[in-house]
């Protein structure tokens, strides 16, 4: 329902993976504004150098795949979405804040996708303040053991409802807990069942070659 209601997608954090944005507009033909300051300068030259050097260890198709990824990247962000080479964070730190990204969108409500490697904590208060403009959010929280209280406070104070939690299996701590988790929030979500099944059938491992991480819930 959140996807059906949204008029625009603001996507924070792209890198070399824009599958979420592709899938989103495949279901809903809307405006997409993406933000990532890192995909310029030496980002692509370093990417190509690594892929071409990987031929030396037998990955003969790596250069071809590198060119293919770059070509698709350029096509998507020239024809399907607008890419701002800006760093998201608190305005007082000189970064682009949430308010500015929302001002660039004429129609509301907006869906947010946030994966900005720890800077998400700088804009949590802004997300809460602008919650009436939002219909859904997917956000990845990093270094969660250091920010448990902030995450709990955000969940309790945000007017959208937490509908799904996905552990990122790329990195785990000494207690087999994920160092990052992905959370999905929706406005007025439709209840589908009285039972919650985790992992959800649509869940996918972030890194297929690594083991699945089980979520451990505690009383709030």
Residue ranges of model-derived segments:
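SAM cofactor-binding core of SAM-dependent methyltransferases
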Residues: 1-94, 107, 143
């Amino acid at each position: 329902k959140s996807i059906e209601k949204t008029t625009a997608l603001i996507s924070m954090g792209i890198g070399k993976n824009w599958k979420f944005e592709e899938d989103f507009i495949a279901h809903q033909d809307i405006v997409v504004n993406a933000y990532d300051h890192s995909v310029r300068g030496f980002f692509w030259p370093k990417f190509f150098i690594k892929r071409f050097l990987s031929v030396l260890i037998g990955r003969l198709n790596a250069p071809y795949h590198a060119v293919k990824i770059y070509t698709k990247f350029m096509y998507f962000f020239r024809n399907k979405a607008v890419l701002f080479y800006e760093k998201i964070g608190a305005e007082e730190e000189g970064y682009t804040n949430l308010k500015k990204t929302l001002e660039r969108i004429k129609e509301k409500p907006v869906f947010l996708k946030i994966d900005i490697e720890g800077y998400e904590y700088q804009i949590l208060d802004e997300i809460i303040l602008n919650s009436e403009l939002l219909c859904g959010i997917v956000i990845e929280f990093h270094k969660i053991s250091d920010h448990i209280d902030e995450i709990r406070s955000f969940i309790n104070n945000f007017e959208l409802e937490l509908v799904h939690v996905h552990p990122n299996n790329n990195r785990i701590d000494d207690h087999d807990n994920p160092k990052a988790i992905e959370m999905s929030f929706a406005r007025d979500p439709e209840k589908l069942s009285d039972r919650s099944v985790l992992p959800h059938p649509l869940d996918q491992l972030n890194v297929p070659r690594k083991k699945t991480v089980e979520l451990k819930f505690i009383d709030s």
